[in-house]
């Protein structure tokens, strides 16, 4: 006999928070990397150091530095127009690639994709 | 008196040069019209004209002779005042005018003034008057010696000089002009002179008072009193004239050195959001920041202008930034302390980021964005949007061309495969049911579970989103195979799941929790056999308790039950499916298993039930004893029965006896039957767009029937790969796409091409078809 009630959500759902979260994050990163045409994914921490990357170190650091500055500028532009607004996503489409950046206060999530492959 | 040296010239041209004598009746005139401008200190603007019987010579009119003037009074005596001092030979003398002959006392006092004035006025005079000729005049003044004068008169003299000098300049200017014109003396030239408004450049009240004024007596008395006083105090020590001189000692150089003043360049970029943040953060500022708001603003932008993120405590480089800020704000000291501690803790920082919820959301978003790039043309086709070609991708264009060419060539309907929902979780599982979310048409719930008893394995419910065809948004693992699904319409996040062991669970798809909200395991009346179909029905009963949605299920134990869940699920039987046909009478129970049911789209009380014995019964939910009607045509279990969405009388049924039957609810025998091959038909569905179109899945193929075209053959047949059976069919309510679930766990999305909806009322079209069929039968 199982006892269920409406408040089951509060317990039992997240039994092992850290491990399952980490696994979920890793899984999602792997799936993104495995998608068609994705060249690399980088997770950069607040200091500009890549903490998860599928590219080589020098490229990762270069991307991290450049995109961080651009994201700051973009965020500044968005908030200048309306201070209650916030930048949520940034996409740069170039001739060869598309760079997608999801910014946050503590990290930067970057994915580079070549959609034409 | 032509020999008089008074060569005062009148301003008017009529006056001959030589014959000019100044008409001085009382000796009041302006003697000092020399270019070197002698100052008549006694004249001020006011006092000049105050002498009663003196004929006032206009300041301007008098011309200054180049040589020294002689003053002659009315008696012809030479009363030219002697200059107090003799200037340098090179400098022209300036004369002092003896204006008030009668005022000796005043004169004596006055005469002391000018010299002082000369010295002191040089600076002030050169100020307002920058004309070059006047510069020479001031030089001559400076050269005159000064005598000590009381301060108050000095100032007055200065001002007097200014006013006098104005006239001097003006007269000097006039002189060259006059000399030119004398040549044309004979001709009368009319010259209209007008006087401008008096421009007061300086106005010093007079210290000299005219003899004839009212105060003269008082002034005289005061002057006398003063002289008396001076005389009395001759020997008094307090009244001794003294002069002082300051010694200027020898100068000595002294060197001082101070610490180098460090110059720091500070730049702040003031942005709108920065001000907004600071304004909002003032209220949030903790006890750390004791600082004023200006400093608070200063710390935040400077860290951002350095190019770091707003969290300076995490940045090693920002340490240097903070240290150079000499404004020791409370927040910066706090940050310095933090920065000292943190560089050691790099690992937890990493973990924190990787576990944050925001990162998960961003990852999901990123995944969708990446997939949107990959699937863009397919999704556009799904949503019936024009497919935009990427100008940078040449390869894709070529593929597209070959693709579209094929479709253009053929005008017959065909299914264009867009994509399929599948992932490693679902591989190998049998798709048993699919249902769209009522509120979000992009959300699809697919149930995976076996339909036979062969391989009992755990079931799976996946909620797929159109935006991510590679991985389901939600995955719910169930204990037994899932056989029925339905989303609630009123609470769009509730998904009812019916399982092979008869359990019904309600999941909340908003969270990814694996436990359902409620479960029917506790219910006493729970189904003991697989639940083949579930529907949420909007009940319009009068009782308040029954209002809203209720869940109805049909199961192989022969019961149609209505489930109410407050705290736990309870069910009430709507109908028990009694066996009609003796042939099918079972010994175990008197009920025949129900396989499917469908509520009438317009009337939620009437519903059809398909049973395992092949009968279809029309029942009413308010009458649970007897069937309203029975339709008997199928020989084998009826797998699906469905009302037409356009015609309220027409319904369709499919069975494992290889046939699909079209019924009208008033006729006991089916109007039309469809069969194509000897294959079990698993699922059928009316097209939500076209009344005469329905789809069917049978072993190995997907068929689309269009009754306008033909009722004998399907209009479209799509064969699946060998070994794979399509087991579920779902039309998309928004677009013209069909979803087919198969026994390998794939849900493929096809786009229906070249099937036109047709004009006219949909229901009428179908009815026409039926009518024509009926008439042709008789």
From Swiss-Prot, chain B:
Coiled coil: none annotated. WD repeats lie at residues 477-517, 526-573, 586-629, 633-673, 676-715, 721-760. Keywords: Cell projection, Cilium, Cytoplasm, Cytoskeleton, Flagellum, Repeat, WD repeat. One of its GO terms (cellular component) is axonemal dynein complex. One of its GO terms (biological process) is axonemal dynein complex assembly. Disulfide bonds: none annotated. InterPro entries: Dynein_IC, WD40/YVTN_repeat-like_dom_sf, WD40_repeat_dom_sf, WD40_rpt. Disruption phenotype: Morpholino knockdown results in ciliopathy-related phenotypes, such as curved bodies, hydrocephalus, abnormal otolith, randomized left-right asymmetry, and pronephric cysts, accompanied with paralyzed pronephric cilia. It is found in: Cytoplasm, Cytoskeleton, Flagellum axoneme; Cytoplasm, Cytoskeleton, Cilium axoneme; Dynein axonemal particle. GO terms for molecular function: dynein heavy chain binding; dynein light chain binding. SMART domains: WD40. Part of the multisubunit axonemal dynein complex formed at least of two heavy chains and a number of intermediate and light chains. Plays a critical role in the assembly of axonemal dynein complex. Plays a key role in ciliary motility. This is Dynein axonemal intermediate chain 4. It comes from Danio rerio (Zebrafish). The gene is dnai4.
């Amino acid at each position: 006999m199982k006892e269920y009630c409406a408040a089951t959500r509060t317990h039992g759902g997240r039994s092992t928070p850290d491990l399952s979260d980490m696994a979920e994050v890793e899984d999602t990163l792997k799936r993104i990397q495995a998608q068609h045409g994705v060249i690399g994914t980088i997770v950069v921490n607040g200091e500009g150091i890549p903490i998860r990357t599928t590219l080589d170190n020098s490229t990762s650091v270069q991307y991290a530095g450049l995109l961080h500055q651009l994201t700051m500028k973009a965020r500044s532009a968005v908030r200048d127009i309306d201070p209650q607004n916030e930048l949520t996503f940034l996409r740069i489409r170039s001739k060869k690639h598309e760079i997608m950046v999801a910014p946050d206060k503590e990290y930067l999530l970057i994915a580079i994709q070549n959609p034409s492959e | 008196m032509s020999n008089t040296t008074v060569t005062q010239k009148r301003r008017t041209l009529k006056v001959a040069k030589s014959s000019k004598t100044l008409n001085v009746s009382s000796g009041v005139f302006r003697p000092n019209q020399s270019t070197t401008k002698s100052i008549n200190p006694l004249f001020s603007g006011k006092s000049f004209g105050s002498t009663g019987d003196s004929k006032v010579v206009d300041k301007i009119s008098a011309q200054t002779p180049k040589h020294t003037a002689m003053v002659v009074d009315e008696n012809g005596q030479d009363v030219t005042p002697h200059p107090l001092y003799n200037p340098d030979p090179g400098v022209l003398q300036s004369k002092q005018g003896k204006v008030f002959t009668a005022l000796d006392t005043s004169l004596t006092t006055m005469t002391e003034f000018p010299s002082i004035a000369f010295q002191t006025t040089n600076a002030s005079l050169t100020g307002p008057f920058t004309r070059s000729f006047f510069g020479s005049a001031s030089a001559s003044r400076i050269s005159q010696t000064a005598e000590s004068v009381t301060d108050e008169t000095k100032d007055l003299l200065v001002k007097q000089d200014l006013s006098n000098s104005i006239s001097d300049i003006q007269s000097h200017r006039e002189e060259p002009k006059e000399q030119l014109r004398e040549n044309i003396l004979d001709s009368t030239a009319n010259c209209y002179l007008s006087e401008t408004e008096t421009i007061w450049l300086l106005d010093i009240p007079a210290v000299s008072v005219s003899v004839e004024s009212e105060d003269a007596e008082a002034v005289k008395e005061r002057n006398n009193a003063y002289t008396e006083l001076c005389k009395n105090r001759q020997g008094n020590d307090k009244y001794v004239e003294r002069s002082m001189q300051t010694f200027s000692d020898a100068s000595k150089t002294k060197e001082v050195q101070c610490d180098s003043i460090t110059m720091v360049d500070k730049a702040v970029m003031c942005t709108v959001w920065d001000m907004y943040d600071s304004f909002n953060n003032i209220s949030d500022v903790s006890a750390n920041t004791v600082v004023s708001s200006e400093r608070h603003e200063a710390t935040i932008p400077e860290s951002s202008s350095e190019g770091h993120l707003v969290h300076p405590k995490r940045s090693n480089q920002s340490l240097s930034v903070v240290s150079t800020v000499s404004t020791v704000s409370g927040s910066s000291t706090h940050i310095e302390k933090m920065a000292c501690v943190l560089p050691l803790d790099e690992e937890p920082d990493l973990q924190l980021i990787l576990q944050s919820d925001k990162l998960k959301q961003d990852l999901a978003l990123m995944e969708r964005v990446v997939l949107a790039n990959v699937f863009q043309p397919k999704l556009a086709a799904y949503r019936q949007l024009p497919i935009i070609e990427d100008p940078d991708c040449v390869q894709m264009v070529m593929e597209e061309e070959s693709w579209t060419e094929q479709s253009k060539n053929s005008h017959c309907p065909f299914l264009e495969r867009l994509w399929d929902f599948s992932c490693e979780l679902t591989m190998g599982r049998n798709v048993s049911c699919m249902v769209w979310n009522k509120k979000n048409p992009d959300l699809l719930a697919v149930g995976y579970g076996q339909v036979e008893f062969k391989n009992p394995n755990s079931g799976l419910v996946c909620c797929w989103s159109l935006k991510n065809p590679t991985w389901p948004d939600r995955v719910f693992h169930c204990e037994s195979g899932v056989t029925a699904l339905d989303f609630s319409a009123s609470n769009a996040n509730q998904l009812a799941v019916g399982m092979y062991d008869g359990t019904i669970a309600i999941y909340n798809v908003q969270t990814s929790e694996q436990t359902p909200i409620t479960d029917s395991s506790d219910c006493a009346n729970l189904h003991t056999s697989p639940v083949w179909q579930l529907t949420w029905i909007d009940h319009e009963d009068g009782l308040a308790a029954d209002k809203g949605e209720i869940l109805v299920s049909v199961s192989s134990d022969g019961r149609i039950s209505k489930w109410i869940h407050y705290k736990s699920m309870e069910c009430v039987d709507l109908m028990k499916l009694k066996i009609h046909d003796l042939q099918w009478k079972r010994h175990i129970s008197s009920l025949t298993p129900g396989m499917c049911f469908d509520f009438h789209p317009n009337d939620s009380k009437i519903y059809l039930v398909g049973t395992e014995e092949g009968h279809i019964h029309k029942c009413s939910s308010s009458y649970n004893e007897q069937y309203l009607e029975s339709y008997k045509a199928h020989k084998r279990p009826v797998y699906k029965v469905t009302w037409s969405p356009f015609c309220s009388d027409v319904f369709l049924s499919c069975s494992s006896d290889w046939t699909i039957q079209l019924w009208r609810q008033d006729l006991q025998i089916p109007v039309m039957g469809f069969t194509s091959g000897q294959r079990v038909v698993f699922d059928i569905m009316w097209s939500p767009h076209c009344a005469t179109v329905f789809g069917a899945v049978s072993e190995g193929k997907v068929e689309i029937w269009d009754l306008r075209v033909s009722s004998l053959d399907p209009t479209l047949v799509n064969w699946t790969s060998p070994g794979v059976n399509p087991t579920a069919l779902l039309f998309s309510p928004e677009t013209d796409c069909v979803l087919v679930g198969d026994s390998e766990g794939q849900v493929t999305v096809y786009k229906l091409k070249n099937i036109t909806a047709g004009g006219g009322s949909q229901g009428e079209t179908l009815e026409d078809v039926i009518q024509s069929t009926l008439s042709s039968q008789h």
